[in-house]
Amino acid sequence: MALLPILEFPDPRLRTKAVRVGVAEVVSSSFQTLLDDMFETMYAAPGIGLAATQVNVHQRFMVIDVSEEKNVPMVFINPEIVTREGDQVFQEGCLSVPGIHADVTRALSIVVRFLDRHGDEQQLTAEGLLAVCIQHEMDHLDGKLFIDYLSPLKRDMVRRKLEKQRRRAS
């Protein structure tokens, strides 16, 4: 397994809309290795979710593990939200927008349909943190970041803060 480089805002590749994954590709050994590498990268970061677009793979899949023990890895390939209910405000962060956290309103409960890592169709009802994480990672697959939900003024403040962090790091 290998750690993959994570793209960081404002990298324009984060704005790319991902394409669907074919079932034949899902079961290939190279795709399975990529999934394993994504989990390793997510856990090492550390994070609870990672979309393929964040590692410069522009296909519709993501890996998630919101468990405390990091022992419930979940794969979502070609995910689609079937229903959304209620609203919740959650403070989100992102591996592609390091050091930034902001309140984002998302659906409280969702039903998502997807393929699992074996190419089998699944449907899952998710609430709370898992629902937030699924919606956040699905946004990445559409080229959207959590900071896009912020006002233009707050987004500009985030951009300046990240530029300052980068200057300090170099």
UniProtKB/Swiss-Prot annotation:
Residues engaged in binding Fe cation: 94, 136, 140
Cofactor comment: Binds 1 Fe(2+) ion.
SUPFAM superfamilies: Peptide deformylase (SSF56420)
Cofactor(s) the protein requires to work: Fe(2+)
Top-level EC class as recorded in UniProt: hydrolase
Disulfide linkage: none
Pfam families noted in UniProt: Pep_deformylase
Keywords of this entry: Hydrolase, Iron, Metal-binding, Protein biosynthesis
Active site as annotated: 137
Keyword DNA repair: no
Recorded GO MF terms: metal ion binding; peptide deformylase activity
EC number(s) per entry: 3.5.1.88
GO biological process: co-translational protein modification; translation
The keyword Iron is annotated on this UniProt entry: yes
Family (UniProt): Belongs to the polypeptide deformylase family.
Function, in words: Removes the formyl group from the N-terminal Met of newly synthesized proteins. Requires at least a dipeptide for an efficient rate of reaction. N-terminal L-methionine is a prerequisite for activity but the enzyme has broad specificity at other positions.
Listed HAMAP family: Pep_deformylase
UniProt xrefs under NCBIfam families: pept_deformyl (TIGR00079), PRK00150.1-3 (NF001159)
Protein name: Peptide deformylase
